[in-house]
Amino acid sequence: MMSFVSLLLVSILFPAIQAKQFTKCELPQVLKDMDGFGGIALPEWICTIFHTSGYDTQTIVNNNGGTDYGLFQISNKFWCKDDQNLQSRNICDISCDKFLDDDLTDDMICAKKILDKEGIDYWLAHKPLCSEKLEQWRCEKL
């Protein structure tokens, strides 16, 4: 009984981040609001996300003195706030750890802001890997 109570307390006090490893065919359904935004088609997003995070929402990469978070690899230098970079501009007005769960709503809102301000080439993988020959990034099931 004591272990059950302990487990219950731990689960209440420390909710688990629900991470998700998406597939190429799951992402278009979740990212449908991104299709065409800023002139970027879904296959370009799917390709870019694959090459930046491997479709894994819990991807964290230390990069050039900053840290990039989640599916879209959003940087703590400018876009989100974390304990490592208290000087972040936090343009998306969000905690970086929000980009590590399976709810992509806030990720997409921030990615759209990045796209508006920086363009698709903010994501370095896009130009060399995802700007042409996108057939392989379409899901045959759709």
Swiss-Prot record:
Signal peptide: 1-19
Compartments, as annotated in UniProt: Secreted
Residues holding Ca(2+): 98, 101, 103, 106-107
A GO BP annotation: defense response to Gram-negative bacterium
Any one GO molecular-function label of the UniProt entry: lysozyme activity
SMART domains according to UniProt: LYZ1
UniProt xrefs under Gene3D superfamilies: 1.10.530.10
Superkingdom field: Eukaryota
Record carries keyword Isomerase: no
Domain (C-type lysozyme) ranges: 20-142
Membrane-crossing segments per the record: none
UniProt feature coiled coil, ranges: none
Any single GO CC term annotated in Swiss-Prot or TrEMBL for this entry: extracellular region
Subunit: Lactose synthase (LS) is a heterodimer of a catalytic component, beta1,4-galactosyltransferase (beta4Gal-T1) and a regulatory component, alpha-lactalbumin (LA).
Family stated for the protein in its record: Belongs to the glycosyl hydrolase 22 family.
PANTHER family xrefs: ALPHA-LACTALBUMIN, LYSOZYME C
Task of the protein: Regulatory subunit of lactose synthase, changes the substrate specificity of galactosyltransferase in the mammary gland making glucose a good acceptor substrate for this enzyme. This enables LS to synthesize lactose, the major carbohydrate component of milk. In other tissues, galactosyltransferase transfers galactose onto the N-acetylglucosamine of the oligosaccharide chains in glycoproteins.
Name under which the protein is recorded: Alpha-lactalbumin
Annotated source species: Canis lupus familiaris (Dog)
Organism ancestry: Eukaryota, Metazoa, Chordata, Craniata, Vertebrata
